[in-house]
Amino acid sequence: MGERVLRVLTCGDVYGRFDVLFNRVRVIQKKSGQFDMLLCVGSFFGTSPESQTHWDEYKSGAKKAPIQTYVLGANNQETVKHFKDVDGCELAANITYLGRKGLFTGASGLQIAYLSGIESSSEPAPAYCFTAKDVTSLKMSLMSNSKFKGVDILLTSSWPKDVSNYGNALPNEASKKCGSALISNLAFNLKPRYHFAALEGENYERLPYRNHLVLQENAQHVSRFISLASVGNLDKKKYIYAFNIVPMSLTDIADLVKQPLDVTENPYRKSDKDTPKSKGNKSAEEEEPTQQFFFDLNKPQGKKRQTDGKGGRQSQAKQPRKHPQPTGPCWFCLASPEVEKHLVVSIGDNCYVALAKGGLMSDHVLILPIGHYQSTVDLSSDVVKEVEQYKAALRTFFKTKGKRYVMFERNYKSQHLQLQVVPLPLSCCTTEDIKETFILQAQEQGMELLEIPEHSDIKQIAQPGTPYFYVELDSGEKLFHRIKKHFPLQFGREVLASEAILNIPTRADWKDCKSSRAEEEDLTKTFRDAFEPFDFTLQD
C-alpha cells in the first residue's frame, strides 16, 4: 500500500503574534526538515492595533508564511471581520481559513474535521459561535456514510467538557470547569485520532483513550486530545506540537487499532449517555503534563542556598514548606530522627540527594522526596519538577566523569520513594547492553520488562498504590514491570553488578557493602565537593 507519512505542526492561540509563530516554524524546519502543514486552533487574530498592523504585512504580501497554514474562525466579535466567507477562503499567501465547520480532505487523503468558534445556547448564534444544530449537521454529514470509521484530525478552538475523565490530571483546577459538552459529543462520534484545541492558555496532552468497549465491540483506533498554549506565552508553556501521521484510509487495519500501553477508557462515553460524570480524576497536583518532541521550552530555575554548617543546605528567606508526613517511623523522611543525615549531599525545596548506604559504587546516590511519598506516581508536580532538575544535574555531572547513569525504582515493600542513581563507566558497556541485560535477566526470573512508549511517562501507566519496578536509561528509554506477586528485592543491583555490566556480583546486596560511619562521611564529602559546580540549589 502506498503509504505516505505526513509531517504536521499544530499550534495554539496566535493572537496576532504572526512573526513569533512563523519564525519559530522556520527554526523547527531548519532543524528537523520540512513539514507538510501547520494547523492553528484557538484565536488566530489579535484585537490590538499592533496585531492589525502585523497582519497587514502578510495580507499585502510583504511577508509570507513559510508553510501552508490552516486556521479556524473567530472566537469573539472583534475578529469576525477577518473571515469574510463562512465556507472558508484564502486570507493571505499560504494562510487559509478552513470555514465555520466541515471536513477538509487533502490530496494525501488526510481527513481533518473542524468546528470554529465557541458554544452558544441561543439561536440565532453570533457569527463567532456554534450551536447544537451546527454540531448535529457536522456529525450527520460524516456519519451518514456507512464506511465512516472516524477522522484523522479534529480541530476545535474550545475544549471538550470532561476530557480528563479517566485520564491524567489537568494542569490546573480551573481547567476542570471549562469545555463544551457539544464538542465532547462531537469528539465521541467522530473518533478523531488527534483532537487539538486551545483558548485556555494551557498545554495538556491527555492519555490516549479507546473508541470501543473492551470485549463488547471490535477494536478501533485510539484518540489523543492535545491542548496547546498561546504563541509566545511568557510562562514558556508548549504551544507547538509536531507529529507524523499516515492517513487512516492508507493505514493497515492491524496497525491502526493497536492499543498503546497507557490507553484509558473513553472520557465522553458516560456524558454522551447523560449519565453521571466519572469521579475518577486525580488531583491537579498528582501529575505534571507530559512534554513531547523537541518543543519543551521549560527551563529549571536555580536558587541561591546557604550551608547549615553541617554539610546540608537550607533555603534562604523562605517560609518552611509543608511536606507530607509519615504515620510512623521512616528512614528517609528528611525531618525524621531515623534519617542518616551524614549521607546527605544536596537539599532542594522538595527533594534531596544522598549517598546510597552500601552503594554499588562510591558515587551511587539516591534522589528522595523530602516529604513522605511512597513512589514516583504519588509525587506532586512541584516534586516531579525538582526530581527532573536533580536528574539533569547528575547526568551532566557524571558525563564529565566519563560515566552514564542508570536510574531505577522499586515500589514494592518500601514506604518511601528511593530513586537509585548508579553511574557506570562509558567504557564498561553501552546503553543497549544495559537495556538488554535488564530484559534478559528479568526473563530468566519469569518477569517481563516492558518498554514504556517514547512519549509516555510512568505516571500515565501506574496508578498510586500499584507495585512496580522501573528503570530509566541515560538515553531516556524506560522499562517497566508491574509486580503481581513476588519480586526479588535486589533485582536492580543484581543486574548492574552482574558479569555483563560491572562484574562485581559480591556487591549485589547493600548489606554486604556497608562502610563505617567515618568512611561514609568521607565519601559523602568527596561527592558533595565534586558535585557542587553542578548543584542547581547553589546557583543564583
From Swiss-Prot:
Signal peptide: none annotated. Residues 265-326 are annotated as: Disordered. One of its GO terms (cellular component) is post-mRNA release spliceosomal complex. One of its GO terms (molecular function) is RNA lariat debranching enzyme activator activity. It comes from the Eukaryota. One of its GO terms (biological process) is mRNA splicing, via spliceosome. Gene3D superfamilies: HIT-like. Pfam families: CwfJ_C_1, CwfJ_C_2. Residues 267-277 have a biased composition (Basic and acidic residues). Belongs to the CWF19 family. This is CWF19-like protein 1. It comes from Xenopus laevis (African clawed frog). The lineage of its organism: Eukaryota, Metazoa, Chordata, Craniata, Vertebrata. The gene is cwf19l1.
